[in-house]
């Protein structure tokens, strides 16, 4: 009988094989995209204020553009990507979000379905559409992408800045416990599950080249406020000439 780990490996390999024949190209040349962007990506662990930092940073970047005599162009996106993906796929947004949050459920019928062609075709289509939406946003530039594998997808664009928000497990657990109104043990379990799901989702977009990526800046959300993170990220964006 196949183990869960082996089934997961087979499932992932089948989806990646389908993506190859559907024409997805995940390997890019940095030289080809040297004039594209600028783009900032924010990857984060559970409880960390990714949306807040993105909003503050977009506002600060736009104020800089206005002060320099240019119209404001910066925006930030997160769940909008899932909405656009669901529209393009003609699927219920909840189905797309379910794919993002957990590519497996542990339910027996899902386990059986994971070996059917339609299951893998659907997942490959969702993965490709999300990839293409994020890639297009990154190429167009002046965008801050929160989560969704943005760092792995936009890794090769020279005019980019990749941020990672992290914190100790105890801090994240207490934060989620308060935000969700659940017990500390429940929050701890949720944090561990979500962080694992996010890591798997990011890894699903990695290539043999993007495996070499390191985040430009990592921030400890326990000891830094959203405003402080925004200020340091803004300085990094200036140093990298994104503004």
Stretches found by the model and what they are:
Residues 77-142:
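ATP-dependent small-molecule kinase phosphotransfer cores
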Residues 2, 16-30, 102, 106-109, ...:
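Small-molecule kinase domains that catalyze NTP-dependent phosphoryl transfer to phosphate-bearing small molecules
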Residues 42-57:
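Glycine-rich phosphate-binding P-loop
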Residues 156-192:
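Conserved phosphate-donor/acceptor-positioning beta-strand/loop module used by diverse small-molecule
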Residues 4, 54, 132, 206-243:
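NTP-dependent small-molecule kinase module
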Residues 60-69:
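Post-Walker A helix-loop "phosphate-sensing" segment adjacent to the P-loop in P-loop NTPases
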Residues 35-40, 44, 141:
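Pre-Walker A (Motif I) flank of P-loop NTPase domains
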Residues 1-13:
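Charged, amphipathic alpha-helical linker segments immediately N-terminal to NTP-binding catalytic cores
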């Amino acid at each position: 009988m196949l183990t869960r780990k082996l089934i997961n490996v087979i499932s992932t390999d089948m989806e990646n094989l389908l993506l190859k024949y559907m024409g997805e190209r995940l390997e890019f040349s940095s030289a080809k995209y040297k004039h594209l962007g600028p783009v900032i990506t924010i990857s984060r662990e559970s409880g960390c204020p990714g949306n807040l930092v993105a909003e503050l940073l977009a506002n600060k970047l736009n104020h800089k553009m206005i002060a320099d005599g240019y119209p404001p162009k910066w925006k930030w996106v997160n769940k909008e990507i899932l909405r656009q993906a669901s529209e393009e796929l003609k699927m219920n947004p909840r189905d797309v979000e379910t794919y993002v949050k957990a590519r497996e459920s542990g339910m027996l019928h899902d386990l059986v379905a994971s070996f059917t062609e339609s299951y893998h075709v659907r997942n490959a289509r969702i993965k490709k559409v999300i990839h293409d939406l994020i890639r297009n946003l990154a190429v167009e530039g002046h965008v801050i992408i929160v989560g969704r594998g943005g760092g792995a997808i936009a890794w090769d664009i020279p005019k980019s800045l990749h941020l990672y928000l992290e914190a100790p497990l105890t801090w994240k657990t207490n934060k989620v416990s308060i935000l969700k109104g659940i017990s500390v043990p429940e929050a701890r379990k949720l944090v561990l599950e979500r962080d694992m799901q996010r890591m798997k989702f990011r890894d699903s977009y990695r290539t043999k080249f993007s495996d070499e990526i390191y985040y430009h800046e990592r921030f400890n959300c326990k000891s830094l406020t959203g405003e402080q993170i925004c200020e340091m990220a803004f300085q990094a964006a200036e140093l990298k000439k994104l503004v």
